[in-house]
C-alpha cells in the first residue's frame, strides 16, 4: 500500500500563525523577546516615518544557515524546545516557532540580515508574505536565502536617523540580526508608537536594564531619548521592600523608609519617639530582616512551596494624596507633583524568565488587582492612626515579582 504525505494549504498555515500573533503590539513583543533569547545586550526598534519602514535590530548571536533552514523555515519548530537555555544562561522566552508569523503580522515584505562567526558569515533572507495567499501548498512556498558581503551599515542604507547608525556602529561588532519590514499593515502614528513604547517599558524588570537595553527610535530621537526606561527608575515612593525566597524557604527582606522629613529637629524627634538608634534607617539605609516563609504565608503545604520554587520581588508603596494636617503631624515629605505611574507601569506585575506575564498588573483591567488588595482594604479599613491592622490599597502599590 502506497504511503501518501499530508500537506497544508499555505494560507491555512498563515491563519494558524495569525491566531498566535493577532495583535500588532503582541507581534512586536514576541520579536523583542526573540532578541533577548539571542543573548543580545542591545535591541533597537526604529520606525522611519519618511520611508515608512520598520527596523528591528539586535546584537545577539545571529542565525547560521543550518538554523535558518532547519528551524526558522519550519513552522512550529524551534531550537528553543530542546535548548531552552541560551549560551549566556538566559531562559528562552519567545514562543516556540512562531516568531516568523510576528513578522507577517507587521508587514507584507521582510528582509533579514544576520551575521555569525565574528561577522565573517553573513546571510540575507527575504520573504513576501503575500505568496502565502495564492492557493499553493506550504511546500511550494519559498524564501530567498543568500550569502552576502553586505554589512549592517550597508543594510541600513536609506535610514533617516543617523543616531541609529551610530549606535549600530558602536554596539554591533561581530554578530547580530536586523529585520527590515516594508509595506506595513498598520498606520504607525504617534499614538501607536507611544503604546508600543509603554509596552516595552514594562516588558522586562528594571533590574535587568544593566545587561539588556531596548531602544525605540523615531526620526528625531537621540540614543538618550530613544532608550526605553522603566518608570520605576525615577519613581517617588514612601516605602520600598525587596525580598527573595531561598530554597530553604527563608525570606530575606530589605526595607527602605522614604516617607519622613524631620528637618532640623530630627534628633529631638527621634529621641522622643525612641528611634534615635535607628536614625540611619531614615537616610537610605535599608532595614534587613529574615523570616521563615510560614511566618509570612501560613497554611501553605510543603508541596505547594516546592512548586513555587525560588522567587524574588520588589514592591513600592506611595501615597496618592496628602493633607496639610497629616504632613505636619507625621513629618511627611511633601508629595506635591508626585507622578502617578499606574497607567504606564501598572500594579504588581509578574515576570517569568525575566519577561512579563500578562495581564497581571495591567492597568485598567480586572487583573490589575490580582492580589485583591482593595478587597482586603475594604474588609479592614483602619487608618494609620487607628488600632488594628492597617492595609494598603491596590492603587498605592506598584512592583514586580520574578
Locate the predicted segments by residue.
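GHKL (Bergerat-fold) ATPase N-terminal catalytic module, capturing the glycine-rich phosphate-binding loop
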Residues: 1-183, 189-190
Amino acid at each position: 500500500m502506497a504511503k501518501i504525505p499530508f500537506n497544508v494549504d499555505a494560507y491555512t498555515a498563515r491563519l494558524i500563525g495569525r491566531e498566535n500573533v493577532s495583535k500588532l503590539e503582541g507581534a512586536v513583543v514576541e520579536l523583542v523577546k526573540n532578541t533577548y533569547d539571542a543573548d543580545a545586550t542591545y535591541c533597537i526598534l526604529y520606525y522611519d516615518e519618511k520611508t515608512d519602514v520598520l527596523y528591528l535590530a539586535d546584537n545577539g548571536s545571529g542565525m547560521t544557515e543550518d538554523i535558518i533552514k532547519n528551524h526558522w523555515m519550519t513552522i512550529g519548530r524551534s531550537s528553543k524546545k530542546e535548548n531552552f537555555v541560551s549560551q549566556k544562561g538566559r531562559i528562552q522566552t519567545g514562543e516556540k516557532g512562531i516568531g516568523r508569523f510576528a513578522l507577517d503580522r507587521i508587514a507584507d515584505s521582510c528582509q533579514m540580515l544576520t551575521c555569525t562567526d565574528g561577522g565573517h558569515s553573513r546571510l540575507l533572507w527575504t520573504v513576501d508574505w503575500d505568496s502565502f495567499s495564492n492557493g499553493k501548498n506550504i511546500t511550494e512556498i519559498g524564501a530567498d536565502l543568500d550569502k552576502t558581503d553586505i554589512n549592517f551599515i550597508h543594510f541600513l542604507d536609506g535610514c533617516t536617523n543617523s543616531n541609529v547608525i551610530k549606535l549600530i556602529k558602536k554596539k554591533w561588532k561581530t554578530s547580530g540580526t536586523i529585520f527590515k519590514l516594508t509595506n506595513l499593515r498598520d498606520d504607525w502614528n504617534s499614538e501607536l508608537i507611544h503604546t508600543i513604547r509603554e509596552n516595552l517599558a514594562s516588558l522586562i524588570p528594571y533590574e535587568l536594564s544593566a545587561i539588556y537595553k531596548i531602544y525605540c527610535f523615531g526620526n528625531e530621537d537621540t540614543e538618550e531619548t530613544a532608550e526605553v526606561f522603566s518608570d520605576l527608575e525615577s519613581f517617588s515612593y514612601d516605602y520600598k521592600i525587596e525580598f527573595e525566597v531561598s530554597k530553604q524557604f527563608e525570606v530575606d527582606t530589605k526595607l527602605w523608609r522614604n516617607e519622613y522629613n524631620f528637618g532640623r529637629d530630627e534628633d529631638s524627634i527621634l529621641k522622643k519617639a525612641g528611634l534615635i538608634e535607628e536614625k540611619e534607617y531614615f537616610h537610605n539605609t535599608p532595614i534587613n530582616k529574615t523570616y521563615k516563609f510560614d511566618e509570612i504565608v501560613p497554611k501553605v503545604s510543603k508541596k505547594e512551596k516546592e512548586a513555587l520554587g525560588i522567587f524574588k520581588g520588589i514592591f513600592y508603596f506611595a501615597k496618592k494624596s496628602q493633607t496639610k494636617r497629616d504632613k505636619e503631624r507625621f513629618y511627611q515629605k511633601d508629595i506635591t507633583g508626585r507622578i502617578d505611574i499606574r497607567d504606564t507601569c501598572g500594579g504588581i506585575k509578574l515576570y517569568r524568565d525575566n519577561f512579563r506575564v500578562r495581564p497581571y498588573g495591567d492597568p485598567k483591567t480586572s487583573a490589575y488587582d490580582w492580589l485583591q488588595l482593595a478587597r482586603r482594604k475594604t474588609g479592614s479599613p483602619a487608618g494609620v492612626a487607628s488600632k488594628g491592622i492597617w492595609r494598603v490599597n491596590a492603587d498605592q502599590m506598584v512592583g514586580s515579582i520574578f
